Amino acid sequence: MPKSKVRKKNDFTISPVSRTPVKVKAGPSSVWFVALFVGLMLIGLIWLLVFQLAATNPVDAPGMLQWMADLGPWNYAIAFAFMITGLLLTMRWR
């Protein structure tokens, strides 16, 4: 049986893949970043609790927050905006 001819590798060569590790551009998040997003989520939670407990009392009740009661359903939007902002910041946390 005849032997096959061996090809010459002069036609083209494939360059080897670089195996050097690539450095990550940014390091871990700082402490203030963690405090910021946790704080924003807690502010939103506290806003909801205060609205439910202090602003929904009967009219002229002691301890009623009139300015918060005047906002009405916008209190939910404000509280959830704080919480969602904190949640979005957690996605940037390293």
Curated annotation (Swiss-Prot):
<keyword id="KW-0131">Cell cycle</keyword>
<dbReference type="InterPro" id="IPR009619">
    <property type="entry name" value="CrgA"/>
</dbReference>
<comment type="similarity">
    <text>Belongs to the CrgA family.</text>
</comment>
<feature type="transmembrane region" description="Helical">
    <location>
        <begin position="71"/>
        <end position="91"/>
    </location>
</feature>
<comment type="function">
    <text>Involved in cell division.</text>
</comment>
<dbReference type="GO" id="GO:0051301">
    <property type="term" value="P:cell division"/>
</dbReference>
<keyword id="KW-0132">Cell division</keyword>
<keyword id="KW-0812">Transmembrane</keyword>
<feature type="transmembrane region" description="Helical">
    <location>
        <begin position="31"/>
        <end position="51"/>
    </location>
</feature>
<keyword id="KW-1133">Transmembrane helix</keyword>
<protein>
    <recommendedName>
        <fullName>Cell division protein CrgA</fullName>
    </recommendedName>
</protein>
<dbReference type="GO" id="GO:0005886">
    <property type="term" value="C:plasma membrane"/>
</dbReference>
<keyword id="KW-1003">Cell membrane</keyword>
<dbReference type="Pfam" id="PF06781">
    <property type="entry name" value="CrgA"/>
</dbReference>
<keyword id="KW-0472">Membrane</keyword>
